C-alpha cells in the first residue's frame, strides 16, 4: 500500500491568501518572516526571511463536531505552488525529531489508541501500519511540541 502526504488544498489556500476569514471568522494576520520556523502548510517549505506570511486558525475537518480541532498555522501570503503529493516524507519535516500521528475514522473523529509521538524516521512505517486498519480513513501529522497541524496522510 502506498501512502500520500497531502498539503492543504490550493482552492482553500487561495481564498485565505485573498483575505477570506479563517476558521474563527477572523482575517488572517499578515507578518514578515525572519526566516526561522515559519512552515507554509501549502508548499510545505519554510517562508524565507523577508517574505510575507499569514497566521490563521485552521480546522482541517469538513464540519464542526467535538473532535474538529482548530489551531494556528502559517501560509505564504502570496501564491505558492502546492507541495506534490508523495509517499516520501517532505523535506520540511525531516529536521524535527518527532511528530504526533493520529488516526481518524470516516466520521472525522479520532480513532482512540492511534495517537502517539512518533520519531521522524519512523513516520512512514507507522503511517503504513495505521492506514492498514479498516477503521482508519486518514491521519493527521501534528507537532509533538505544540500540536500544530502539519499535513494529512492518506492511502495512496
Where are these regions (language model features)?
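Conserved mixed alpha/beta catalytic, RNA-binding, or beta-rich assembly cores of soluble enzyme
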Residues: 18-98, 102-116
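Extended boundary segments
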Residues: 1-17
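Short, hydrophobic/π-rich interface segment
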Residues: 102-138, 142, 155
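C-terminal edge-of-domain segments
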Residues: 149-156
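Short Gly/Ser/Thr- and Asp/Glu-enriched loop/turn motifs at secondary-structure junctions
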Residues: 143-148
Amino acid at each position: 500500500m502506498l501512502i500520500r502526504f497531502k498539503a492543504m488544498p490550493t482552492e482553500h489556500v487561495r481564498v485565505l491568501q485573498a483575505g477570506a476569514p479563517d476558521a474563527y471568522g477572523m482575517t488572517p494576520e499578515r507578518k514578515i518572516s525572519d526566516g526561522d520556523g515559519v512552515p507554509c502548510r501549502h508548499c510545505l517549505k519554510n517562508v524565507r526571511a523577508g517574505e510575507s506570511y499569514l497566521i490563521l486558525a485552521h480546522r482541517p475537518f469538513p464540519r464542526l463536531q467535538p473532535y474538529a480541532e482548530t489551531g494556528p498555522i502559517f501560509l505564504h501570503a502570496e501564491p505558492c505552488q502546492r507541495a506534490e503529493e508523495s509517499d516520501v516524507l517532505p523535506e520540511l519535516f525531516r529536521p524535527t525529531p518527532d511528530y504526533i500521528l493520529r488516526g481518524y475514522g470516516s466520521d472525522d473523529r479520532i480513532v482512540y489508541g492511534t495517537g502517539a509521538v512518533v520519531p521522524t524516521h519512523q513516520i512512514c512505517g507507522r503511517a503504513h501500519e495505521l492506514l492498514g486498519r479498516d477503521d482508519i480513513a486518514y491521519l493527521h501529522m501534528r507537532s509533538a511540541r505544540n500540536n500544530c497541524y502539519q499535513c494529512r496522510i492518506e492511502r495512496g
